[in-house]
Amino acid sequence: MLRLCPGDNLGQRSWLGSLLLRAGRVSDALSFVQAWMAPAADRGDVIRHGGTDFGKPSSEALPASREEKLSDYTEASLLYTAAITSFKLFGDCTAARQYLRIAAKLNPIILVKILARLKPPSMIDSESHEIFVLTSSLIRRP
């Protein structure tokens, strides 16, 4: 769908990274969310193939100015996916910690639910539920 509508008018980007991760495509998941967190997305530029033109993901930490910008507007689902995938690909690195810090700032209830080992809801009625359902089992896996 993102290749047909790379501007993502339907909001597919909020969950595709988590689905790629669940499918074992860790590198593609990080490449995807990094494409949507790039400065081009801030400007409203169309992301090539909606971010599904997977490349090699970066392990570099973001500059402070970029971290601040992402903290203001980005969907938490992208950042939680970035945190998990960075950790899986590169270990306990600065980028993984940075993504998690930004995600927790945007939507802290996700971490609370995961740390409390709450069972994911059977019905998704908010962004928090969506992120929790799609990523909680991935975070808990060894």
Sequence positions of predicted segments:
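Eukaryote-skewed repeat-based solenoidal scaffolds used as protein-protein interaction platforms
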Residues: 1-77, 86
